[in-house]
């Protein structure tokens, strides 16, 4: 049923009264508008929505359908990666002279491209109208008049995580385009004379995705992220009086509470006790800090693109370093020096108690450093209006410039930043400040040697005092034609702006490479604690199917031995998450013998003490399937003195990693070895003798690929085994 509204406009004070669907405003200069289409999203739970004027229903596509409290009744949440509503409407319903669109939006993330809230356009037909958002949260109106493409963009950005009422009027008849935000006109532009172009017959429409089509690599980048409600299309012109009347139909919007109850119950690869965002892409962790009973960790985040583009700062919190909850993103690119992305950085509690961060901003041409501050324990951050405090890299480096890490020592803030010199190798540059505002460049703190395999660029540097006067200096070499990205470190002293290493050649952090870019902090008990990223290294298609990419490690505790080697153990807080204990007991293991353990699981901790006996190899099997033959084999090889992570038979999918990785490690045949294994969906973490650590990822396809076993080759051994299920 067409909703008919007759408005009489006043040039002075508005005194309104209502009679059914008629509003009178001082009865001056009548204007007629009609409601043509409406989506109110008040359906209770099914996977479709109804357009109320025609009664037609349309499916909601995407990974899951999440309804939430809206402006009036329910609203619909769009994940920014997969959710959209598509259909067609009869073109005869749509006017070609004047049209007004009203909708309520609460964006969670801004897009990489131009995301549509409502699109009635077609990439090929050169017709229609689209109302959406760009990467800065500005309202974008795209439309065709007499087949010619036109675009109007607001100078004002709408806020994230808060309801905003958007009204857009397009009138070739009066040659105007008007954009209202919360009933206030924020943009008024010209439109060419002519007629709004519509296709003949039916007009395709999309809610939550731009029908014009926009991609970056393998991913579409025009999905809307956040909540939408009360989408209405009117004939007639949008004026301040019309905006006031439409807005007056609604009360004051409440706080936004997104329904992020994404159903991962059918995803065997999703972890339950490793830190991971609700969905989307994640990268390096940093800024791990403890404040007033809560741990905060920040990370590279993108909810609307599974890769590097328009990164922002994600935020996780935890009471104990194990059970993490995602909070709202705290830093977002804005026009200017950080418009192309907020890259990594560090968090620090300033000497006056202010929670602060320092971060890398990029504008598309160069990187600089800026700061931001919090007045609510890191729930929000306010950028420093003087940013960038360091606008560009020093002249003596000629590669990238990013990833600041800061400490306070001897009355100064000391900051190192990753960089490099192409002809020499990776390095970190060094700055100091008395007030966290004015920074003095002090030169290159430490220069690597590209000829020694140390890479040409270093990222994610760490300078951490692990014991009295003894520092860890850790960097990550970026991948090159000699080796992948890998973390290595020196230990030594840091005095008077100089780091003096205890040994010449760096040590690798991992036995088998797979754990990168650790965030390092002191926990509430004074222990050095680290959490890093464990990439999935699967295809973009597989990531798109999952709806997320990468995750973070369980917390580790680091100590140093006398030789300056970092000893790595799982954090003791993990013990609190142990569930059922399964005592396997003592096992005698013979070469070729299988089914030594009667246990199946995807989320558990296994502690095994091996008496390695005469075996040439000893290890364990995960993700074992009787139906497909899939299995993930992890073992120590005495003949090569290596730990081996063999994923060659771990999956029947061609979209995931199925490689074999090795890492040198010295063990004596016949010795006793304690191995602590954490399995959580697709991720593996192994701790050896409470000293060393390595990781892996595996993605079996079969439903029964959850078998666990121990094995030996070339001799015999024994093991004492206890398994705990892990609950979270």
Where would I find each of the regions flagged by the language model?
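Extracellular/lumenal carbohydrate-interaction signature centered on repeated Trp-anchored short motifs
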Residues: 30-35, 89-101, 123, 155-164, ...
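Extracellular glycan-interaction surfaces
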Residues: 56-82, 102-111, 130-196
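Flexible glycan-contacting loops in extracellular carbohydrate-active proteins
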Residues: 70-71, 189-227, 696-720
């Amino acid at each position: 049923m067409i909703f008919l509204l007759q408005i009489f406009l006043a040039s002075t004070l508005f005194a309104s009264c209502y009679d059914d669907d008629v509003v009178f405003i001082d009865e001056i200069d009548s204007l007629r508008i009609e409601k043509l289409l409406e989506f109110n999203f008040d359906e209770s739970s099914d996977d479709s929505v109804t357009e109320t004027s025609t009664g037609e229903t349309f499916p909601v596509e995407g990974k899951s359908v999440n309804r939430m409290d809206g402006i009036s009744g329910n609203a619909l949440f769009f994940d920014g990666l997969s959710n959209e509503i598509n259909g067609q409407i009869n073109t005869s319903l749509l006017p070609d002279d004047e049209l007004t669109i009203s909708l309520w939006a609460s964006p969670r993330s801004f897009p990489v491209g131009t995301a549509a809230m409502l699109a009635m356009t077609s990439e090929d037909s050169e017709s229609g109208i689209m109302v959406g958002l760009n990467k800065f949260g500005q309202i974008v109106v795209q439309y065709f008049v007499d087949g010619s493409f036109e675009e109007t963009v607001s100078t004002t950005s709408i806020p994230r995580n808060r309801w905003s009422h958007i009204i857009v009027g397009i009138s070739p008849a009066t040659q105007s385009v008007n954009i209202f935000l919360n009933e206030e006109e924020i943009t008024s532009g010209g439109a060419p004379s002519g007629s709004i172009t519509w296709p003949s017959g039916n007009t395709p429409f999309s809610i939550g995705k731009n029908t014009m089509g926009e991609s970056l690599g393998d991913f579409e980048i025009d999905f809307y992220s956040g909540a939408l409600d009360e989408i209405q299309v009117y004939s007639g012109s949008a004026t301040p009086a019309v905006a006031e009347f439409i807005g007056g139909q609604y009360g004051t919007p409440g706080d936004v509470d997104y329904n992020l109850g994404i159903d991962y119950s059918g995803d065997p690869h999703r972890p339950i006790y490793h830190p991971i965002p609700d969905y989307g892409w994640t990268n390096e962790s940093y800024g791990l800090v403890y404040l007033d009973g809560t741990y905060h960790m920040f990370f590279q985040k993108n909810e609307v693109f599974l890769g590097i583009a328009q990164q922002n700062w994600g935020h996780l919190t935890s009471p104990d370093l194990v059970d993490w909850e995602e909070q709202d993103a705290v830093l977002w690119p804005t026009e200017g020096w950080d418009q192309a992305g907020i890259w990594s950085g560090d968090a620090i509690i300033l000497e006056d108690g202010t929670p602060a961060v320092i971060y890398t901003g990029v504008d598309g041409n160069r990187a600089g450093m800026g700061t931001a501050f919090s007045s609510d324990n890191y729930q929000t951050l306010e950028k420093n209006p003087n940013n960038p405090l360091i606008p560009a890299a020093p002249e003596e480096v000629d590669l990238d410039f990013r990833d600041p890490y800061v400490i306070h020592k001897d009355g100064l803030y000391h900051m190192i930043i990753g960089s490099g010199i192409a002809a020499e190798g990776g390095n970190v540059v060094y700055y100091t400040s008395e007030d966290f505002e004015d920074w003095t460049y002090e030169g290159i703190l430490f220069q690597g040697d590209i000829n020694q395999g140390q890479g040409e660029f270093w990222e994610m540097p760490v300078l951490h005092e692990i014991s009295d006067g003894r520092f860890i200096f850790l960097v990550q070499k970026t991948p090159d034609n000699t080796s992948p990205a890998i973390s290595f470190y020196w230990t030594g002293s840091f005095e008077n702006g100089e780091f003096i290493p205890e040994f010449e050649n760096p040590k690798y952090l991992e036995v088998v490479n797979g754990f990168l870019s650790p965030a390092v902090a002191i926990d509430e008990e004074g222990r050095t604690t680290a959490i890093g990223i464990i990439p999935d290294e699967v295809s973009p298609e597989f990531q798109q199917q999952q709806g997320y990419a990468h995750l973070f490690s369980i917390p580790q505790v680091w100590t140093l031995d006398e030789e300056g080697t970092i000893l790595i153990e799982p954090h003791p807080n993990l013990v609190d998450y142990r569930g059922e204990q399964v005592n396997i007991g003592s096992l005698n293991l013979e070469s070729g013998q299988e089914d030594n353990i009667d246990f199946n699981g995807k989320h558990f901790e296994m502690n095994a003490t091996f008496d390695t006996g005469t075996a040439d190899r000893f290890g364990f099997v995960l993700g074992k399937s009787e139906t497909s033959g899939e299995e993930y084999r992890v073992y120590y090889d005495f003949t090569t003195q290596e730990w081996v992570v063999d994923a060659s038979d771990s999956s029947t999918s061609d979209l995931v990693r199925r490689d074999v990785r090795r890492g040198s490690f010295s063990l004596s045949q016949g010795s006793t070895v304690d191995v602590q294994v954490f399995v959580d969906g697709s991720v593996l973490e192994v701790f050896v003798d409470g000293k060393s650590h390595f990781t892996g990822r595996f993605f079996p396809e079969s439903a029964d690929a959850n078998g666990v076993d121990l094995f030996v080759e070339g001799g015999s051994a024994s093991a004492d085994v206890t398994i705990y299920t892990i609950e979270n």
